[in-house]
Each structure stands twice: as C-alpha cells, then as structure tokens.
C-alpha cells in the first residue's frame, strides 16, 4: 500500500511540472487544467488511502505459565488429579425408648439382668457416617480402588463429644477380565456376609447375626460353573482379637497365638426361582487365643447364608451358624471364654459353645415406603457358662421407612427383646425407635 502511494505522488509531480514546458500553447493550457483537476482528485484519494492505512497491531505478550506445584517437576500433574474421589455418608439421629434396661443404651445388644421395667430414653447422632471412595489409577487390566469409612461410636467420649470409630480402611486390586481381586485392609469379615435392614445400629448382633470387621488380606476368585451359575471363592487371613484385648489393649491373646485367623467362603449364584438369582453361601473361620502357656482356646464357626429375591418388592434373606468362642464376632451374647477369678487373678477356663441364626423379609419400595420384618436368636451352651450368665437372647423387629426425597428418610422401628440368664429371671424389653436420616 505504501509503494502504491509513492508511485501516485511521482506521477502527480511530473504532471504538475509539465505546464512550465508549454505555457504558450492554448491546447496545452486546456490539457493542463484538466490534468490539475485530475491531480486534485488523485490527492484526495491519496489522503483517503492514508487515513485508512493503520500500523500493524502489536503481538500480545505471552501469558506466563502458572508456577509448578511445590515438590512437582514442571509438566507433571498433582497426584490428586489422577484419582476419582467420592465423598459419601449420612447424618442420622436416633431417638429410642426402652421399657427395660438394655446394653448399652443408644442401641440394643441384650437386656440387663435385674432391670426389668427400668425404662430409659436415649437420643444420639453417633451413627452419623462419613466415607471416601477412591478410584484409580488403573494399570493395564488392573483397577485399583480404596474405601475409608468411619462413624462416631468409638469407645469412651461423652455423648455430645463422641470419638471416631474406623469401620473400613481398605484397598482393592481388581482384575475384571480374570474375575480375581485382592483386598488388603480392615473391612467386614468373609464369613456370614449378610445383615438385616434394622434401624437399630447393631443389625441383630449378639442376637443371631455374627460377623464383624477385622484387618485382613483377602483373595477372591469368581468361576463360571454352568449356564447362568457362578461360584465365588474367598479366603482371608485376619487379625485375631481375644476377650481380654477388648478390655485391656495391652494384653493381646490373639497376637500371642503366633498366627492369624483363617476365614473362607464358597458362594453359589444360580437361577432357582424369583426374578433374580438365588445366592447360597457356606463359610467358616478358625483362630486361636493364647492367654498363657497353658491357656489356649480355639475360636471357630461354620455358617450358612441365603439370599432369595422373590419379586421386585419382596426379598428374603437369613443366616445360621454354630461355633465356639465367638464374642469377637458378636456371637455368644458377648461371651467367648469362661473365666473365674481367684485371689484377684483371672483364670480362663473354657471356650463357650454357641449357635444361632436370623431371617428377615424386605417389602417394597412402594412409592416412598419400604418395610422390614425379622427375628434373630443366639443360644450358648448352658454348661459352658457360670450362674447368672446370659444363656439366650432373642429379638423380633419390624420397621417402616418413608423417603421424603432421594436423600432424606424418616423411619420408625418396633422391636421386642428377651434375654435369659442361668439360674435367674429373664428380662423382656420393648423398644420404640425413630430415626431421621439425611444421605449424601
């Protein structure tokens, strides 16, 4: 554009100089007048062109790169950006009235001897639960994940200042193509994996439902054994925790045994009847507690679990077991080894035999309503316990839960409890519990 302007200027200068060469010729004079008019027109056009010509815009300054995160090399992402982390849980308030004294109070395991008719009222938010689900990173066909979950039923702590209780803290390495997984950490036991849907915190523990949570290393393999049939085999080594360890953490009879507890389960999933497959499992565990060189007691169980969906709104499930020294698995009505105190010294005498089971039916959901009914029974060998000890514990329950929306529930549960004692009167309790639940 600038070159074109200079060319027009040279032409205009040459044209302007021509009148000096031919002033006497009238024709030339006329032509000069025409040329001057054209030059004036060209000058105006040049001015217009100059006005439209703009200098090139300056290039924007480069945007400085954000500073690298502390401890990371340039170009590398923070570790958190490689993981999928989901926060979950619920807030739960339980209000309960009992017609007799129960143990421990905020929830029921069994009734207390000598407290028939001694009613009590409890109000707590300690079952509020918080958790993290972590996914990734994956390598090849292996997927890694983890779970950390806690509530506020930790030991000690005032009711309005509860302590944290770690429920789950485990990682899973899963090979989906091979249907094989490894779990390492604390989570629910391999044995007796089912539980009833109760508002009471302890899901019929010490009343026919055994199985708790322990640190463990677990291997699981799924096998196809026929048309629409799957066999799941799971085996684990887990921490053994004895009676005295529950009262005095410095005394560890489970660790003193020198080896872990062994747990295993075989579960078969197959179409029997109903709209979903039936699941039947057989499981067992064996461990040992050593209190002294002469005091060694085995802990063992043999268990059956059944899950049967009948139709979209009816599901039946239950478990049965037999074993000994099961207090660490919420069996034996909280009694594992028979003890006797002589001269201030506690002597451990015998593992307490135990048997029991439970069943439950889930009804619904219908619109916003769902219902659960069930029963459980735990019976110990009477000859294995001393006088006044608990020999039988039974519970019946029914609840109704109404969903205000997808996150908020209100539930009411009615349960009846009866605990029998050796050479003493049994104690009955009626419990009415209301729960408010907000899930996230």
What are these language model-derived features?
Residues 98, 137, 152-157, 187-193, ...:
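Sequence/structural signature of outer-membrane beta-barrel proteins
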Residues 21-104:
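N-terminal periplasmic/intermembrane-space "pro-region" immediately following the signal or transit peptide
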């Amino acid at each position: 554009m600038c070159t074109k302007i200079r060319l027009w200027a040279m032409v205009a200068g040459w044209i302007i100089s021509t009148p000096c060469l031919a002033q006497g010729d009238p024709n030339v004079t006329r032509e000069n007048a025409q040329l001057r008019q054209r030059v004036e027109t060209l000058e105006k056009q040049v001015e217009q062109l100059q006005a439209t010509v703009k200098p090139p815009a300056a290039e924007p300054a480069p945007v400085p790169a954000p500073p690298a995160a502390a401890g990371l090399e340039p170009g590398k992402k923070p570790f958190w950006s490689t993981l999928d982390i989901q926060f979950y849980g619920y807030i739960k308030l339980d209000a309960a009235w009992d017609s007799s004294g129960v143990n421990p109070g905020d929830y029921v395991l069994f009734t207390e001897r000598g407290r028939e008719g001694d009613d009590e009222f409890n109000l707590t938010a300690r079952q509020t639960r918080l958790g993290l689900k972590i996914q990734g990173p994956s390598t090849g066909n292996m997927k890694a994940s983890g779970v950390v979950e806690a509530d506020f039923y930790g030991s000690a702590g005032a009711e309005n200042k509860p302590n944290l209780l770690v429920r789950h803290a485990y990682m899973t390495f899963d090979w989906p193509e091979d249907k094989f997984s490894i779990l390492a950490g604390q989570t629910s036991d391999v044995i007796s994996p089912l539980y009833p849907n109760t508002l009471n915190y302890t899901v019929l523990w010490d009343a026919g439902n055994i199985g708790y949570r322990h640190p463990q290393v677990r291997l699981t393999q799924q096998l196809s054994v026929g048309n629409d049939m799957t066999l799941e085999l799971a085996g684990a080594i887990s921490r053994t925790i004895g009676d005295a360890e529950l009262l005095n953490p410095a005394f560890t009879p489970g660790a003193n045994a020198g080896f872990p507890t062994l747990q295993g389960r075989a579960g078969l999933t197959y179409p029997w009847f109903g709209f979903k497959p039936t699941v039947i499992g057989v499981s067992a565990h064996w461990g040992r507690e050593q209190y002294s060189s002469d005091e060694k007691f085995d802990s063992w169980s043999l268990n059956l679990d059944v899950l049967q969906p009948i139709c979209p709104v009816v599901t039946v499930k239950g478990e049965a077991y037999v074993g000994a020294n099961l207090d660490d698995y919420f069996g034996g009505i909280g009694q594992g080894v028979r003890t006797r105190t002589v001269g201030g010294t506690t002597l451990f005498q015998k593992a307490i035999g135990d048997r029991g089971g439970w069943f439950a039916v889930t009804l619904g959901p219908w619109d916003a309503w769902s219902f659960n009914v069930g029963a459980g029974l735990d019976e110990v060998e009477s000859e294995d316990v001393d006088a006044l000890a608990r020999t039988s514990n039974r519970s019946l329950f029914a609840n109704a839960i109404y969903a205000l929306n997808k996150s908020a529930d209100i539930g009411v549960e009615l349960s009846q409890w009866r605990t029998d004692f050796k050479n003493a009167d049994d104690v009955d309790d009626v419990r009415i519990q209301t729960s408010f639940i907000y899930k996230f």
